[in-house]
């Protein structure tokens, strides 16, 4: 069956307000610029800009902000046929506090948010069958009815041979407690093909399936999760990231840059890596170099979605490799060797 879409995503859509009078406390900021936000939305836009066909399962408010999101998606050539409007819920609002190049905080308003109102009846098997990869953002598991909708999409994809990517995307907002987080993250992770998360997110996902997960290192987590998935990426902020498969381990550094803000790189990282994973799975070293380069580019940007064109990212990556040929290193590794 010919696939109409390269990726369909399900997850968080928000409105971001980033201060233009930055390096200031939020209470003293007066001027803000409005952007589309949310990890799933940012990744969808990034993938579309990389010439992928992208669809989306989602829910937005039936108001001006909801219209803004749909207009942005249409302008970015993302299919909106499965994004519904809800009259009784509003899109989440995110205000960013950019205190310095290194330090940023986020103030979120996510009570009864629209993006968590997607329902099991909104999940269409025919739509899922039209994609090569389903990308699930972990925030969409925080509450019902979105939680059940995501699980339906997960199992429909899995049972029909559609690859599933789990972008953990943990945000404490909306969740009742950590046990709930770990329970649903574990269910999705154990039924995925690829996991992307920070060390802390992987630890949270592993609380019920590994003993004393807080004492484990990246390699320990990888050995466990590779029993279920084909590939896992563990990110460690300024320490870089690691990619694991059963017989492959790659270690990527970050590309040092003068940052504008201390967040926003993760969605660009995911966009570039997933694009490369789909198009050239045999060359993951280059995919990881592109991903870490894209992350460094985005922490210099005022928004978290405005990914530059591929040629600029490629040039940035090539220059980074000239400065540091060991930007991505291959390590000796076999997950199941005794």
UniProtKB/Swiss-Prot annotation:
Full protein name: 5-dehydro-2-deoxygluconokinase
One Gene Ontology MF term: 5-dehydro-2-deoxygluconokinase activity
Pathway(s) served: Polyol metabolism; myo-inositol degradation into acetyl-CoA; acetyl-CoA from myo-inositol: step 5/7
Gene for this chain: iolC
CDD domains, A to Z: KdgK
Catalytic function, reaction form: 5-dehydro-2-deoxy-D-gluconate + ATP = 6-phospho-5-dehydro-2-deoxy-D-gluconate + ADP + H(+)
UniProt family annotation: Belongs to the carbohydrate kinase PfkB family.
Enzyme superclass (EC): transferase
Claim: DNA damage is one of the keywords in the record: no
């Amino acid at each position: 069956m010919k696939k109409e879409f390269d990726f369909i995503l399900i997850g968080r859509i928000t409105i971001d307000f980033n201060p233009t009078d930055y390096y200031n406390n939020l209470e003293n900021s007066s001027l803000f610029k409005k952007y589309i936000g949310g990890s799933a939305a940012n990744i969808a836009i990034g993938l579309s800009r990389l010439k992928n066909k992208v669809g989306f399962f989602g829910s937005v408010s039936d108001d001006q902000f909801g219209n803004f999101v749909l207009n942005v998606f249409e302008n970015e050539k993302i299919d909106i046929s499965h994004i519904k409007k809800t009259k009784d819920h509003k899109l989440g609002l995110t205000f960013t506090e950019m205190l310095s190049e290194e330090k940023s905080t986020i103030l979120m308003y996510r009570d009864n948010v629209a993006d968590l109102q997607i329902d099991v009846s909104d999940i269409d098997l025919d739509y899922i069958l039209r994609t090569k990869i389903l990308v699930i953002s972990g925030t969409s598991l925080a509450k019902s009815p979105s939680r059940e909708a995501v699980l339906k999409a997960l199992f429909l994809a899995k049972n029909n041979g559609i690859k599933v990517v789990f972008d953990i995307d943990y945000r404490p907002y909306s969740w009742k407690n950590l046990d709930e987080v770990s329970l649903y993250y574990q269910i999705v992770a154990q039924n995925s093909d690829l996991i992307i998360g920070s060390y802390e997110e992987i630890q949270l996902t592993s609380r019920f399936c590994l003993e004393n997960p807080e004492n484990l290192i990246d390699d320990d987590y990888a050995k466990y999760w590779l029993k279920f998935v084909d590939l896992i990426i563990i990110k460690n902020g300024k320490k870089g990231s690691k990619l694991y498969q059963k017989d492959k381990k790659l270690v990527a550094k970050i590309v040092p840059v003068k940052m504008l803000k201390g967040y926003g790189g993760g969605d660009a990282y995911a966009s570039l890596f997933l694009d490369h994973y789909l198009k050239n799975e045999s060359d993951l070293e280059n995919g990881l170099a592109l991903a870490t380069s894209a992350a460094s580019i985005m922490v210099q940007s005022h928004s978290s979605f405005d990914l530059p064109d591929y040629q600029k990212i490629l040039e940035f990556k090539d220059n980074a490799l000239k400065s540091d040929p060991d930007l991505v290193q291959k390590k000796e590794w076999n997950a199941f060797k005794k």
